[in-house]
Amino acid sequence: MNILFAGGGTGGHLYPAVAMAEEVQRMVPGASVLFAGTSRGIEAREVPRLGYRLHLLEVRGLRRGRSLKDMAANIGIAADFAAALASAVALVRRERPDVVVGTGGFVSAPVLFAAQLLGKKTLIQEQNAFPGVTTRLLSALATEVHLSFAEAARYLPKQKGVMVSGNPARSFTQVDASAAREHFGLDPSRPTLLVFGGSRGARSINNAVLRHHDLFCAAANLLWQTGSVDFERIRDACPPSRHLQIVPYIEEMGVAYSASDLVLCRAGASSIAELTNLAKPSVLVPYPYATGDHQRHNARALVHSGAAEVIEDSVLDSEESAAAIMELLHDGARRSAMSEAAGRLGAPDAARHLALRIISLAGTKQGS
């Protein structure tokens, strides 16, 4: 069985593909897996490190502005896409995959389209509540389309073969909350606010929490991943405290989630998958410049289900926003209701379910 995964650029597009690939090879030990990506994406480093084969294509995303400069750049990008499509056709013909899986990012479009032109079975896995342009354009020709949010279906041209399967995410082993807090040097008896904005951090989140950290630490523990860029600035501005732990990056994220009673973070698809799989109440701050404003769509889905609250990036540092976070830290019953709502949205078996669909499309029996 040969499976070709196309997706990357960011971890949000790559790691769901990796999770599915791992499950496919666990279920079908002899399965051959190949990734297609670009030299500029995270996949150029991560896929070889994980031990998978990687084929690089040169492709860029269209600029969304309307200036003459953007239009001129898009002419060159269109030429690049044509070349990438030709390379993708050659790749699909050479590798003869049984199924081609697209998870988004610039590279997924030419590879999926090439597979569809050649009559290959294709599966699209869409992470966001507002589907990416590749999903919207190519879903009508896909064999199956798997969504993380039911809301995404309304943006697709057809409903046949479309199903909600969740977003494959990292799995974490939960530990006792008190022990988890002690692991980070925090007061085990206090509720804990976990803050993160990605591996590089989020400047607006960091600035807002810096402004109000004394208020948060007066009532709770604050476990704060600043990212590498802001770490020294934030650390130097905050005196040491039994109720405050500032780190550039949290390696043991499962322990951090276990320690937390409330999470303040962006609304990226991977973070939301982790929050819902672990039934964590959250305050989401959508990144205002995300493509297609997809983080706001993601956050809205959780808010409508009662699993989260949203604070806009532009007002995060306000007194009102800090008060809203404090209110949640003081209201255990409300957090409990949010946790139950988040858990109902979770799909911890998403990678396994999608791997089974890939194996079925390939016409291969599990374990063969």
UniProtKB/Swiss-Prot annotation:
EC no.?
A: 2.4.1.227
Positions annotated to bind UDP-N-acetyl-alpha-D-glucosamine: 10-12, 128, 170, 199, 250, 295
> Its encoding gene is what?
murG
Q: Which GO terms describe its cellular component?
A: plasma membrane
Keyword field contains Plastid: no
Identification of the protein by name: UDP-N-acetylglucosamine--N-acetylmuramyl-(pentapeptide) pyrophosphoryl-undecaprenol N-acetylglucosamine transferase
Among the record's GO biological process terms, what is one?
A: regulation of cell shape
Main EC class the enzyme belongs to: transferase
| Subcellular location as annotated | Cell inner membrane
Lineage in the entry?
Bacteria, Pseudomonadati, Chlorobiota, Chlorobiia, Chlorobiales
For this protein, what reaction is catalysed? di-trans,octa-cis-undecaprenyl diphospho-N-acetyl-alpha-D-muramoyl-L-alanyl-D-glutamyl-meso-2,6-diaminopimeloyl-D-alanyl-D-alanine + UDP-N-acetyl-alpha-D-glucosamine = di-trans,octa-cis-undecaprenyl diphospho-[N-acetyl-alpha-D-glucosaminyl-(1->4)]-N-acetyl-alpha-D-muramoyl-L-alanyl-D-glutamyl-meso-2,6-diaminopimeloyl-D-alanyl-D-alanine + UDP + H(+)
Q: Which keywords label this protein?
A: Cell cycle, Cell division, Cell inner membrane, Cell membrane, Cell shape, Cell wall biogenesis/degradation, Glycosyltransferase, Membrane, Peptidoglycan synthesis, Transferase
| Entry GO MF terms | UDP-N-acetyl-D-glucosamine:N-acetylmuramoyl-L-alanyl-D-glutamyl-meso-2,6-diaminopimelyl-D-alanyl-D-alanine-diphosphoundecaprenol 4-beta-N-acetylglucosaminlytransferase activity; undecaprenyldiphospho-muramoylpentapeptide beta-N-acetylglucosaminyltransferase activity
Reply yes or no: does the keyword Cell wall biogenesis/degradation apply: yes
